[in-house]
Amino acid sequence: LIWDKDEFSLFIDLGTNGEMAITDGKRMIVTATAAGPAFEGGPGKAVAGSDMVAVTAFLLKEGIIDETGLMAGPYFEEGVTVALSDAMNAPGSSDGVYLTQKDIRDLQMAKAAVRAGVEVLWKKMGCPEISQVCLAGGFGYYLDVDAAAVIGLLPEKWKRYTRAVGNTSLAGAFQMGKDLWTGRLQEERLNKTLQGIESINLAEQENFEEMYIRYMNLQSS
């Protein structure tokens, strides 16, 4: 459990909604943002959200899109098909994904909302040195962290602290039940921990809109 650690940890679970939390082991601040379908692969897309991040980073590196997300030349009207073997450096994969300008814009909006949310939490906690970034769920398990940094979904400086933690809702509930049963976690301490959780509404936070607009760009930061 991330509040068991006497260090600053960030937790991110991405899907149609993006749930985020930051803790120093005692205090915890949580929030959520609507990411839309982009991190689920988009409507009608037979591709995972983590693949969308990798493909977008590939298009950026190849100059097919620029930092504003604009597709070059004929791709703006026609879209582009990208082989996952190229985007994800996975030789032998014959799968490809077709993306339009709208797909890129959808990903930009989702990415901006999550990155701005992360920054709000970080600043609310006092801009600490982050010791670990935990990515939950299937998205986090398969996410290419380098690609996430290339498009600015995560700060470049946090790459080496980032790790996938799997199905945390199930694992966390199991671990908590086990710790309560064995006495490792006392009910009094659990209640105190829960009382120390602060939930914030991103729309009400100062400079959130400004950060959201800034992070629409696809660039490392």
Predicted features by range, described:
Residues 106-128:
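Phosphate/ATP-binding catalytic cores across multiple sugar-kinase/actin-like superfamilies
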